[in-house]
Design a protein with these regions (language model features):
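Short, compositionally biased low-complexity segments
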Residues: 21-25, 114-124, 251-255
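A generic alpha-helix surface/boundary motif
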Residues: 74, 126-127, 205, 276
Length: 365
């Protein structure tokens, strides 16, 4: 039986009693700069505006997952069948080192790369998460950018197949669909002096192609996009990565343009940006002590550590949850309950059950 956790999850916005209040204006806007949060439920918009007003222009930052949090659907999971259907990415053209297990072919059916990816996920997330980024190795970034733009403009679903109970099953995969609400939130945060970072379990370079391209509206600085980083091989045969270039202080517009000619390799940089690695990435690339005033996600296992460890609740920080699956909602509710118990047991400030905003994907369009 599911444990009773009504006190934790029934409220859209749960506020610590010790959190100082900010007087709310009649319109709930707090005199903030940037776009209004028109594509948000009223209560959620009010909570977000209140938090932004309290933390504006004070050295704070927010972190967001990308797939299914900042836009609807998954970039890698749709780009893979899209390129396979075009004949651009196939088992014959993929790096041979990425054939981790045999393909599941039959006399009448050749397994798709999408199906292969799903079977790797059945083994372990730690197998398929990196593979989903590595599979795009061998492509120059400029070529991949062209395909990503094609995919983002593609107004149809992408047909592919996978195995379900050992039977070949047809399916349709949706390309990413921009959440207008998140575009508003990103830009309102930045307009009020709060930096925005993306911390994604997807390929950093692929995510950057959307998050940092002005035509998609997010306007995230390229250096603020953190994801699964793969080494790039330049035309001179040298290896590098955006993360190294940023650390070395050479990630200029000129360097970014040169990177478009560099080829993605299958070699991974660390830390790996999924599960606890998301929190590790924040500590490594953003700040060891200044915690985010907002952390947003949609997948309990992958985003949970960043959300629970990260949010500065003492400053009114928000745990933002895009509530896309009943099973995931039940799982995150259970994590809230268990983490609250654990914090109390250890005599720590209880933050796990404070300041949650839950929003459905349909409410962000």
């Amino acid at each position: 039986m599911r444990p009773s956790i009504n006190l934790v999850v029934n409220a859209l916005w749960l506020t610590s009693l010790s959190t100082p209040s900010v007087a709310a204006p009649s319109n709930g806007n707090y005199g903030l700069k940037g776009p209004e949060l028109k594509h948000w439920p009223a209560q959620a918009a009010k909570a977000l505006n209140k938090m932004i007003a309290r933390n504006a222009n004070n050295g704070r930052y927010a972190v967001f997952d990308m797939d299914n949090t900042s836009y609807q659907f998954d970039l890698e999971e749709s780009l893979l069948p899209y390129l396979e259907n075009k004949g651009v990415l196939t088992r014959e053209t993929m790096d041979p080192a990425l054939k981790l297990v045999p393909f599941k072919d039959t006399k009448k059916h050749k397994e798709s790369l999408y199906s292969y990816y799903l079977r790797l996920c059945e083994i372990e997330d730690a197998v398929c998460y990196p593979w989903a980024a590595q599979i795009f190795s061998g492509f120059p970034l400029g070529e991949l950018k062209g395909y990503v733009d094609e995919l983002m403009a593609y107004n149809k679903t992408i047909p592919t197949t996978y195995f379900e109970d050992d039977k070949v099953t047809a399916t349709e995969v949706s390309p990413p669909k921009i959440f207008e609400g998140q575009v508003e939130l990103y830009n309102r945060l930045m307009a009020n002096g709060i930096k925005v970072y993306v911390v994604s379990a997807a390929s950093e370079e692929l995510v950057r192609m959307v998050a940092s391209d002005p035509k998609y509206g997010y306007n995230v600085p390229p250096q603020n996009v953190i994801g699964v980083s793969l080494f790039l091989k330049t035309k001179k045969g040298e290896i590098t990565t955006a993360r190294k270039q940023i650390e070395d202080g050479v990630y200029t517009q000129k360097t970014q343009k040169q990177n478009l000619d560099a080829e993605m390799t299958p070699w991974l940089w660390a830390p790996a940006t999924w599960k606890s690695g998301k929190w590790a990435a924040i500590l490594t690339y953003i700040d060891e002590w200044n915690r985010p005033i907002l952390a947003g996600g949609d997948t309990p296992d992958s985003d949970g550590p960043m959300i629970f460890q990260g949010v500065d609740v003492a400053r009114g920080g928000i745990h933002l949850w895009v509530d896309r699956k009943p099973a995931y909602r039940e799982q995150i509710d259970g994590m809230i309950k268990n983490n609250t118990i654990a914090q109390k047991k250890e005599g720590l400030p209880v933050t796990a059950d404070k300041n949650w905003v839950f929003v459905k994907p349909t409410e962000l369009h």
